[in-house]
Structure formats: structure tokens, C-alpha cells
Amino acid sequence: MAAVGLSDTVTVTPAQALTVQTVPASDFPMQKNTAYRAAVAMAEHYGREANICVTIEKRIPLCAGLGGPSTDAAAVIVALAELWGIDRTDPALDDIARGIGADVPFFLHASPAFYVGGGDVLATEYPALPATPVVLVKPREASVSTIEAYRRFDEAPVPADKPGAIASAL
């Protein structure tokens, strides 16, 4: 995995209760939002109240395999760690992130890395890549959820062709 220069803007501010809003607005249930789930998981683990308002300005296309919801969850974990004075190297943060989604731990660190298992087990971390132009194309009409993509793959798995070659190139 490697991060690209495309991001949502996640703003976390103190509030009377936990709320999550997206710009543009979405009819997706707030309680299912990964940022909301991350705030709840952090509060439960650290015995705190997640009295925050999370505003997410969406720029990462949904259902494009770019980790948009996972980046938002990671941003909330980082924001609450900072707000509550929790050391960013606390291993519990990775555990909390993993409970939200397999790729959320990657977005806590965002260093190029090779993950194994369900995509949640760090095998190798690499130094930052030099700035490389990347073109991303995501047609409006074409979308597939990550869950659906993995379900389809599991129905007809294809063995990876020399994943070590990709890792060596990094």
C-alpha cells in the first residue's frame, strides 16, 4: 500500500455529543460511518466521552478502492489521541484501527508498506517514495464496494503473480 496525494478534510471539534457530518451531505446512517465507529471505539477503550463533532469534506471517491472511509477513521483516531494526550505509538491505536477496518492501521502511518493476511498485518514498511505523478480515473457510473470486491475475489481467487517483485521495487 502507498498513500497518494488525494484526501478528505476531517475536522474534529469539541461538542455536546458525538456527531458526524459529511460535505456533501449523505443519507448514510451516522452510526455506520467509520469515523463515528472510530470515535466510539476510542472512547470505549480509553474510558472517555467522545463529545466531538466530526466534519468530513469528501474528496476521495467512494467505492473506488482508495480507502476514503478508512482514512477518515484514521484521522479521527489521530485527532482523539492528540486531544486526549495519548502517545501516537500506543499499540492500542493500531488495534482500535484494525477493529474498524483492515486497512485503517495503514492510514495511521501512511508509509509505503506491504501487508499480508486480510490486508491488516504489516509485513514490511518502506521508506517514503519520491514524488511520482499518478493519474487516478474513477468513472461516476462504475463503483464497487470493497466488501463486494473481496466477495467476488473469494468466489474465484487468482494467485498473486510474484508479489515479491513489487515489494522489491519499493
Model-predicted segments: where are they?
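Gly/Ser/Thr-rich beta-alpha loop segments that engage phosphate groups in nucleotides
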Residues: 35, 65-71, 103, 119-121
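ATP-binding N-lobe of GHMP and related small-molecule kinases
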Residues: 1-64, 82-94, 128-130, 138-142
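Alpha-helical scaffold segments in soluble metabolic enzymes
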Residues: 37, 41, 79, 148, ...
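Short, small-residue alpha-helix embedded
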Residues: 70-83
